[in-house]
């Protein structure tokens, strides 16, 4: 049986306009007060000046009703307008601010007219609401909330289904924090649907279009797994299948797919509080669909006893697991009973913190460069190092993207900033995107970039920069760390690429659900996937699909090229779950180019440290497919060298990424026959030569390798396997730019700097490209590369970059140039003066001067 939310009709006011702040009443049609059983009008407009006909619990009634307009001298009172009718109204904040709580319930009365209306303002919390309740049975017939504004707005209610029934009004205030109050006035009946005019809204500032009072219009909540699938809204041609649901899976916080397409799922039961050592209850399950019907038929409990596990990824003979303070690797062996641990978890990294248990290390994925990437939230402060390394190798992170190399055992902060990113992916050109919460939602993450932050200050993202700016950071007691390597010389940061938002309000989603629902659903996002599956319609190729928690849907953004980066355009939502409890946390491709989605599924939508507030009994995994083709069985781990290489130009990123990682594993493992000559022998005609210089024009390229993404995949594979030489890279860079892609040149620059010191020949090419290359993408990668070079090495490159006046209006380049330039100015005021003479970008001239005069 479906658990339906209370059904009601909520009609918005007609034309909305600005209100004269000197007025104390809203223009409204004449209404009729409800009457009691003895025929006397009830005090539902408070014009008796007291609370007769109302019954209170708690201290909600203290000091009520309020008389007259809002006191402009009270806290936050300046400019506030109540929009009340008559002299008296219920003003939940006016006497004692947000402290009082309780309920205020009217005497029951009969519905004598087909329509009713009232005014409501105050908070948008579920715990600050006005309800119309049936006297018999106590069923809530209607519920409305404010929109975090003191100005009350009219709500019109269709009561025709309840004619001649007895109902009562109940004002509920269970919240004591910000906007923890209700404003209410003037409940009356109407013979016809009333039309209101001259009503203010929270968005009706000068020059802005006013927003109507939103309705809480999510169709369902608390559905069973089977009902949840039926409730979804999908585009034509798509279908959703329940792959697994409770009791088979509960609290799925992270998942990955192995080389056989099996799902490895982390169930997190310890959140929101890390348990004492040895008391963790999180576990890893493995699901397999052997008949291709989109539903699991084999389930294995792989590992139990993890503590605050938050991320997982397959690779190098096991699974990488994030469980603060550790990055773990659990080796896997195959048995008749399913996959089992082949040994104890190996601790690879230490120092991940958990001050905020919903902002920890999360959403692992393999980058195109062969590193394991992850995200990290802003209100958790980690000091990370490789296990066994000295404290002088710790790197601080409290917002951003990090990466770990599986064979070189290195940890790096890739980019710094944003808020609580919980979703990361790469497009066909290897460009990194994340989603964020609270602040704008979409960012193109560039190596060495510093980004808008929800809170806190920018920090040094490398050990070298931390030693230069905050050398005593490394001398503290990291058992109780307090110091952060804050850098005061950033001056500004990179902003969102999105040209839109998915929520109303300033920063927090302070409006009701429907106001944000029209534009995307809300500020809380989790999970991001760049669709590169190859089996969905072409219109989805390259689009970014991200989960929206408050909006119970999957949003879609379209990254369109502009300058050195992208603009994120809004596209229609891909999927709406129509279920308030749905909270998807990530989505990933499968071997057929369809998509799996994990759903935490919980009535409690926002983070709270109160563990009992979370429902531990449920969780879902859905499969979203296009068409009716059955799932195929794969095992890429059994493919030989030639067949693995043949997967690289696939249009399905699941296949190309897994094939590349397997090749990386086997070369790293010194498997006989997996070397450069063997790779050269098995690559299709011309592509190996094309990327190593001997086929400069690509005349003999196999058809599959004529696309830039396919060429990049080969380039990344050669690098990840260690089979791409310095000479290969230099030959590629030395070609005329019209014979190579700007993306190939850009990636050659990044990969040459992976080992920090690319060599004098490469540095000379960098300086030449900085001066002459026509591509802003190449210049962007050079700016990133400079941050991995010494002051002396980067100087000629920076001098050439900052002379590009055409880059002054680019979204990324002026600030990326500054991040590369700042250490030069810090090293020598004379150098700063020389750079001023070369800089053709006004922002850089300003920042160079500012840094020269800083203490």
What function would you assign to each model-found segment?
Residues 205-646, 654-657, 661-664, 669:
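Beta-propeller domains with acidic blade repeats across secreted/periplasmic ectodomains
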Residues 133-167, 172-179:
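Extracellular carbohydrate recognition and processing domains
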Residues 24-60, 65, 190-233:
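N-terminal pre-domain segments of enzymes
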Residues 598, 611-619, 623-855:
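Long, ordered, helix-rich scaffold segments
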Residues 87-113, 126-128, 152-155:
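Short beta-strands within extracellular/lumenal beta-sheet-rich domains
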Residues 50-89:
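Extracellular glycan-recognition surfaces and repeat-rich motifs
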Residues 99, 109-117, 164-166, 539:
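Extended extracellular/luminal ectodomain segments enriched in beta-structured repeat modules
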Residues 175-191, 197:
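Extracellular carbohydrate recognition
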């Amino acid at each position: 049986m479906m658990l339906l939310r209370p059904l009601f009709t909520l009609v918005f006011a007609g034309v909305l306009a600005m209100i004269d702040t000197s007025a104390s009443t809203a223009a409204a049609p004449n209404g009729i007060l409800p009457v009691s059983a003895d025929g006397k009008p009830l005090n539902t407009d408070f014009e008796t000046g007291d609370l007769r006909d109302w019954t209170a619990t708690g201290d909600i009634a203290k000091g009520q009703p309020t008389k007259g307009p809002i006191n402009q001298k009270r806290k936050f009172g300046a400019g506030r307008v109540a929009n009340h009718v008559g002299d008296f109204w219920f003003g939940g904040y006016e006497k004692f601010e947000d402290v009082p709580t309780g309920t205020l319930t009217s005497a029951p009365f009969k519905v004598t007219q087909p329509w009713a209306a009232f005014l409501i303002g105050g908070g948008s919390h579920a715990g600050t609401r006005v309800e119309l309740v049936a006297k018999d049975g106590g069923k809530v017939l209607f519920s409305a909330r404010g929109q975090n504004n003191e100005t009350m707005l009219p709500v019109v209610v269709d009561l025709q289904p309840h004619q001649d029934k007895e109902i009562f009004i109940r004002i509920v205030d269970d919240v004591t924090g910000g906007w923890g109050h209700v404003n209410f006035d003037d409940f009356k009946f109407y013979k016809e649907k009333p039309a209101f005019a001259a009503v203010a809204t929270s968005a009706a500032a000068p020059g802005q279009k006013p927003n109507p009072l939103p309705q809480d219009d999510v169709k369902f909540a608390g559905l069973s797994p089977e009902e949840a699938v039926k409730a979804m809204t999908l585009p034509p041609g798509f279908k959703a299948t329940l792959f697994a649901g409770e009791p088979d899976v509960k609290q799925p916080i992270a998942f990955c797919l192995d080389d056989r397409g099996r799902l490895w799922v982390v169930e997190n039961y310890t959140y929101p509080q890390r348990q004492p050592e040895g008391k963790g209850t999180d576990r890893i399950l493995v699901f397999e669909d052997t008949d291709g019907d989109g539903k699991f038929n084999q389930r294995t409990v792989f590992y139990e006893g993890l503590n605050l596990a938050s991320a997982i990824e397959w690779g190098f003979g096991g699974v990488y697991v994030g469980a603060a303070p550790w990055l773990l690797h659990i080796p896997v062996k195959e048995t008749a009973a399913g996959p089992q641990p082949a040994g104890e978890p190996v601790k690879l990294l230490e120092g991940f913190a958990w001050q905020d248990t919903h902002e920890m290390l999360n959403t692992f994925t393999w980058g195109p460069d062969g590193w394991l990437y992850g995200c990290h939230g802003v209100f958790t402060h980690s000091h990370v190092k490789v296990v066994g390394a000295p404290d002088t190798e710790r790197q601080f992170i409290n917002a951003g993207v990090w990466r770990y190399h599986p064979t070189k055992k290195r940890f790096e902060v890739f980019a710094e900033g944003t808020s609580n990113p919980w979703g990361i992916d790469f497009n066909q050109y290897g460009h990194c995107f994340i989603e964020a919460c609270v602040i704008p939602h979409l960012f193109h993450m560039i190596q060495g970039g510093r980004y808008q932050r929800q809170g806190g200050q920018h920090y040094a993202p490398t050990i070298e920069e931390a030693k230069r700016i905050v050398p005593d950071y490394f001398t503290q007691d990291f058992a109780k760390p307090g110091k952060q390597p804050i850098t005061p010389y950033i001056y500004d940061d990179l902003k969102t690429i999105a040209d839109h938002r998915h929520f109303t309000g300033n920063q927090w989603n302070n409006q009701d659900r429907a106001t944000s629902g029209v534009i995307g659903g809300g500020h809380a996002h989790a999970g991001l996937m760049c669709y590169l599956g190859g089996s969905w319609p072409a219109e989805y190729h390259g689009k970014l699909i991200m989960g929206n928690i408050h909006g119970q849907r999957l949003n879609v953004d379209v990254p369109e090229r502009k300058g050195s980066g992208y603009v994120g355009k809004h596209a229609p939502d891909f999927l709406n779950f129509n279920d308030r409890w749905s909270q998807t946390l990530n989505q990933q491709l499968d071997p057929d180019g369809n998509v799996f989605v994990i759903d935490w599924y919980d009535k409690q939508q926002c983070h709270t440290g109160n563990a009992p507030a979370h429902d531990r009994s449920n969780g879902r995994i859905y499969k979203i497919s296009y068409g009716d083709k059955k799932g195929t069985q794969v095992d890429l781990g059994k493919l030989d060298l030639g067949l693995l290489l043949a997967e690289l130009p696939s249009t399905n990123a699941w296949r190309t990424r897994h094939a590349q990682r397997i090749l990386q594993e086997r070369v790293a493992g010194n498997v006989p026959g997996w070397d450069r000559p063997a790779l050269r022998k098995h690559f299709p005609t011309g592509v190996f030569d094309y990327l190593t210089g001997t086929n400069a024009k690509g005349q003999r390229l196999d058809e599959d390798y004529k696309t830039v993404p396919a060429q990049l995949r080969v380039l990344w594979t050669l690098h990840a396997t260690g089979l791409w030489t310095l000479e290969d890279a230099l030959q590629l860079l030395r070609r005329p730019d019209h014979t190579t892609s700007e993306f190939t040149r850009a990636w050659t620059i990044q990969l040459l700097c992976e080992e920090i010191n690319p060599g004098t020949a490469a540095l000379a090419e960098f300086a030449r490209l900085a001066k002459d290359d026509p591509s802003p993408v190449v210049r962007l990668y050079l700016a990133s590369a400079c941050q991995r070079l010494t002051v002396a090495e980067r100087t000629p490159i920076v001098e050439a970059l900052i002379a590009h006046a055409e880059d002054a209006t680019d979204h990324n380049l002026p600030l990326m140039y500054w991040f590369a330039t700042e250490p030069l100015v810090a090293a020598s005021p004379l150098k700063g003066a020389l750079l001023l003479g070369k800089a053709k970008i006004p922002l850089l001239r300003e920042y160079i001067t500012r840094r020269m005069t800083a203490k």
